[in-house]
Amino acid sequence: MKNRTAMYDFTIIVPVYNEEDNIQAIEQQLAGYLPHALRPACVLFVNDGSTDKSLSLIEEVCRRRPDFLYITLARNGGLSAAIKAGIDVTQSPLVGYMDADLQTTAEDFNLLLRDIDDHSLVTGIRANRKDTGFKRLQSKIANGFRRMMTHDGAEDTGCPLKVLHTSYAKRMPFFTGMHRFLPALILLQNGTFRQVPVRHFPRTAGVSKYHLWNRLVSPFIDCLAYRWMKKRYINYSIAGSNLNER
């Protein structure tokens, strides 16, 4: 059964977990972007089991803005689960996502959309990151280890601004932490990706949901899971069939 995302070319997934202080700003930014998006676009909030007022605020936004949609998960499953849930229900040809912390801007989706016809995935690279030096160091170490383990060549998989062809996104094997491996998972499907510099801003409201464990230690464990999965990944293409013959 088709849903309202099928009416658009591009669905922007916004995972939300306890971001009540940011919902109004997210609405304003995305509402300002949609009229001049390079592709007809909608917004899909994924409420990841928030325990604050995020869900009620999202429902209010979606009631007054027809291009804003939402799903809500029964419990908090983490960023990868929220992204997967959004991709699973998306029926537009293109899908992307951004974080609810507004450290990236929706305006930069147009930088990614310019190249999406030529690639399976276009991902941002955070230029002039506004995080603390300790956070940048953690990301540098985690990205270096991931590149060594995956050989994907991606510089900044933690950048929360990405656009994919939905057909590729739906075929990707998902696991906890998979959002760190999108370029590698695209390469497993014989796809291609491009990296584009995007702007980065300091967080102005709410609190980070990440700490030393899930910014540094968890990615190391996820790399081992990826290597195990890669050895067992099944990739095929159908050369012919009679499914459509009468």
Q: What do these predicted regions represent?
A:
Residues 1-131, 167, 193-194, 240-246:
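Structured catalytic core of nucleotide-sugar glycosyltransferases
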Residues 1-8, 144, 151-152, 175-246:
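Hydrophobic helical membrane-anchoring modules
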Residues 13, 31, 41, 59, ...:
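Conserved protein kinase catalytic domain
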Residues 50, 75, 130, 134, ...:
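Residue-level signature of the cytosolic catalytic core of signaling kinases
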Residues 88, 135, 162, 179-180, ...:
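Residues that recognize and position ribonucleotide moieties
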Residues 119-170, 221-224:
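Short, flexible, basic/aromatic active-site loop/helix in glycosyltransferases
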